[in-house]
Swiss-Prot record:
Pfam families from the UniProt entry: RsgA_GTPase (PF03193)
Subunit architecture: Monomer. Associates with 30S ribosomal subunit, binds 16S rRNA.
Main enzyme class: hydrolase
Gene responsible for this protein: rsgA
Record carries keyword rRNA-binding: yes
Name of the featured protein: Small ribosomal subunit biogenesis GTPase RsgA
Record's keyword terms, sorted: Cytoplasm, GTP-binding, Hydrolase, Metal-binding, Nucleotide-binding, Ribosome biogenesis, RNA-binding, rRNA-binding, Zinc
Domain of life assignment: Bacteria
Domain CP-type G: 104-273
Membership in a protein family: Belongs to the TRAFAC class YlqF/YawG GTPase family. RsgA subfamily.
Any single biological process term in GO: ribosomal small subunit biogenesis
Length: 350
C-alpha cells in the first residue's frame, strides 16, 4: 500500500465520527483519544469479534480495537485508524479503527437468523473454482454465477485438476466450458498439482482483489497455496462459535498478498452461496443470456417453463441458449422454493 496523507474530506469523516461517539458514549465509555496517535490509512486484513488486524501503509499489521460507532467492518475494508501510543496503559492492542471508507463492492451471504451479512469488501472479482473430480457440476457453477451477477462482481471460472484428463476427457470438458465462453465468461483450465495454466491465472489476479469460491474437494486451498508460495500457506484459524447452537468452529476471513501482485481474501463464507433470499426475478436476471429475451414472452407473468409463447424457451429450442443452463435455472428456482418452505416452517415453529 502506498502511504497517503489524509484528505480534508477524510479528516472531516474522522471528526464527525468522533462527535457521534461523544453523543453515544453514555452506555459505556469509549477509548480515550489521548491513548492514540495521528490518523492514518489502512486496510482490514482480518476481523476477530471486536478487534481487527489492520495493515498500515508501510505493510505492518496492527491489532486494533473498533469504535462502537462503526456498524459494519469486514476484511477488505479500507479504514482510517490510529496507532496506540507506547505509553498507553491498560490497552493491549496497537491501535483503533476510527472510520471506514465507502466500499466499491461488498460480498454478502444470507443467514437464516441475521438476514444478509457482509463477509468481505472491495472485491474486484470472484474466482469460481471447480474441478473434474469429485464431479464437474455445471449446476454449482451456475449458482455461483447467479450470485456474482446479483452482487455485480466480475466472475472468473477456473477448472482445476486438468492433469487428470486424457485427450477425450479434455475435449468433452472444453465443450462444457464453451457454454460459458460463448456467453462472455472467462474460463481458465489449470492444475495446482502440475502448475499447468497457473501463469494466465496469475495474470488475471494481478492488481486486483479476488476471492476464491468453491466446494470442498475442488482443490481451492491447494490452488491458493501454489499461487501464494509455500512460505504463505493458507492456515485455518479456528475460533469458537458461541451461538448456543452446538459445537462449531469457523475460520476468519483473511487477506493475503500474492507475490506476483494482487490480493486474495480467503473466507469460509463463500464455500457455497445461498440464493434462497433472492426473488425469482433476480435469478432470471442472473442468467446473462436470458437478457435479450426478457419482455418478449407472450404473457407478462411468464414463468419461462411450459408457458405458451415463452421467448426464453423458444430460444433454447432454437439452440440460442444452452439447454443445460435452462435446466439449471429451473433447478435453482426449485431449490430456492424448498429452502424457503423449510425456513417458513421453522419460523412458525418458534
Amino acid at each position: 500500500m502506498s502511504k497517503n496523507k489524509l484528505s480534508k474530506g477524510q479528516q472531516r469523516r474522522v471528526n464527525a465520527n468522533h462527535q457521534r461517539r461523544l453523543k453515544t458514549s453514555k452506555e459505556k465509555p469509549d477509548y480515550d483519544d489521548n491513548l492514540f496517535g495521528e490518523p492514518d490509512e489502512g486496510i482490514v486484513i482480518s476481523r476477530f469479534g471486536m478487534h481487527a488486524d489492520v495493515e498500515s501503509a508501510d505493510g505492518d499489521v496492527h491489532r486494533c480495537n473498533i469504535r462502537r460507532t462503526i456498524r459494519s467492518l469486514v476484511t477488505g475494508d479500507r479504514v482510517v485508524w490510529r496507532p496506540g501510543k507506547p505509553a498507553a496503559e491498560g490497552v493491549n492492542v496497537k491501535g483503533i479503527v476510527e472510520a471506514v471508507h465507502e466500499r466499491t463492492s461488498v460480498l454478502t451471504r444470507p443467514d437464516f437468523y441475521d438476514g444478509v451479512k457482509p463477509i468481505a469488501a472491495n472485491i474486484d472479482q470472484i474466482v469460481i473454482v471447480s474441478a473434474i473430480l469429485p464431479e464437474l457440476s455445471l449446476n454449482i457453477i451456475d449458482r455461483y454465477l447467479v450470485a456474482c451477477e446479483t452482487l455485480q462482481i466480475e466472475p472468473i471460472i477456473v477448472l482445476n485438476k486438468i492433469d487428470l484428463l486424457d485427450d477425450e476427457g479434455m475435449e468433452f470438458v472444453n465443450e462444457q466450458m464453451d457454454i460459458y465462453r460463448n456467453i462472455g465468461y472467462r474460463v481458465l483450465m489449470v492444475s495446482s498439482h502440475t502448475q499447468d495454466g497457473l501463469k494466465p491465472l496469475e495474470e488475471a489476479l494481478t492488481g486486483r482483489i479476488s476471492i476464491f469460491a468453491g466446494q470442498s474437494g475442488v482443490g481451492k486451498s491447494s490452488l491458493l497455496n501454489a499461487l501464494l508460495g509455500l512460505q504463505k500457506e493458507i492456515l485455518t484459524n479456528d475460533v469458537s462459535d458461541n451461538s448456543g447452537l452446538g459445537q462449531h468452529t469457523t475460520t476468519a476471513a483473511r487477506l493475503y498478498h500474492f507475490p506476483h501482485g494482487g490480493d486474495v481474501i480467503d473466507s469460509p463464507g463463500v464455500r457455497e452461496f445461498g440464493l434462497w433470499h433472492l426473488e425469482p426475478e433476480q435469478i432470471t436476471q442472473g442468467f446473462v443470456e436470458f437478457h435479450d429475451y426478457l419482455g418478449l414472452c407472450k404473457y407478462r407473468d411468464c414463468k419461462h417453463d411450459t408457458d405458451p409463447g415463452c421467448a426464453i424457451r423458444e430460444a433454447v429450442e432454437e439452440g440460442k441458449i444452452a439447454e443445460t443452463r435452462f435446466e439449471n435455472y429451473h433447478r435453482i428456482l426449485e431449490s430456492m422454493a424448498q429452502v424457503k418452505t423449510r425456513k417458513n416452517f421453522s419460523d412458525t415453529d418458534d
